[in-house]
Amino acid sequence: MIKIGAHMKISKGFTKVPPDTANIGGNTFQIFTSSPRVWKVNPPKENDVEGFKNAMTEFNINFEDVLVHSSYLINLASPKDDIREKSITAMIEEIKATDQLGILHYNFHPGSHLGEGEEFGINKILEGLDIIFKEVQNTKVTILLENVAQKGSNIGYSMEQLGRIINKSPWKERLGITYDTCHGFDSNYDIRKKEEVQRLLDEIDKYIGLNKLKMIHLNDSKYDVGAAKDRHEFIGKGYIGREGFKTFLSFDEISKLPLILETPGDDPEHSQDIKVVKEIFKELGKL
């Protein structure tokens, strides 16, 4: 069974997300818990939580298959103490909101060291995660590190880097990863080629463990492999292309996972992208 959906707006309330997902042909989704551009996190209201959970059941969406994405402001690797402190506080509140909604996975970008060096950044991420987990250890939420584009001082563009963070953490059992196809393509994982998809899976298995690969951000790229631009494109319309995604999704280790679109546009465009992905699954004999 295909698990496919998109990043959905919460502006109409959490309760509307499951029906809106079904309307575009999806059965999974990603949301923010609050505005991603401010530090303040507003916890969901009790009636919103109840309505959301009822809608999830009504539209047969599995809580394990959906994802909360962190605020854009968060940077656990920052050399600035105030930014790290704000990031830690925001993540704690967002994870508590995730747990309230019954969602089991929370996704964040590891961060940028801003010139202080990779080792500095990784140590700060580990310190931050330790503080966060001590505050949210009674929740059921797994924190997923997302691979990022290999640009600037970003941390987490390679599976080896993500593995170093996860394996050094005392909270390893509560950590996993989301793989973003555009970010990976930016970082020279050329998933248009079978041998490159196999290399990716081998690296995940070696450095992290394939069991920790929980979600896929399915995005085409406006730029060619290794460009490090982080510009998402509609499925099949970018440099990865329809055939590239067919190669990528031919691997059962990937096609069995929830596939979340972060492509441009809104519900109509996401509906079209979902149709394209379903067509690819049919061509592969998986639907």
UniProtKB/Swiss-Prot annotation:
SUPFAM superfamilies: Xylose isomerase-like (SSF51658). The keyword Nuclease applies. Zn(2+) 1 binds at H69, H109, E146. Zn(2+) 2 binds at E146, D180, H217, E262. Binds 3 Zn(2+) ions. Zn(2+) 3 binds at H183, D230, H232. One of its GO terms (biological process) is base-excision repair. Its EC number is 3.1.21.2. Belongs to the AP endonuclease 2 family. Endonuclease IV plays a role in DNA repair. It cleaves phosphodiester bonds at apurinic or apyrimidinic (AP) sites, generating a 3'-hydroxyl group and a 5'-terminal sugar phosphate. This is Probable endonuclease 4. It comes from Petrotoga mobilis (strain DSM 10674 / SJ95).
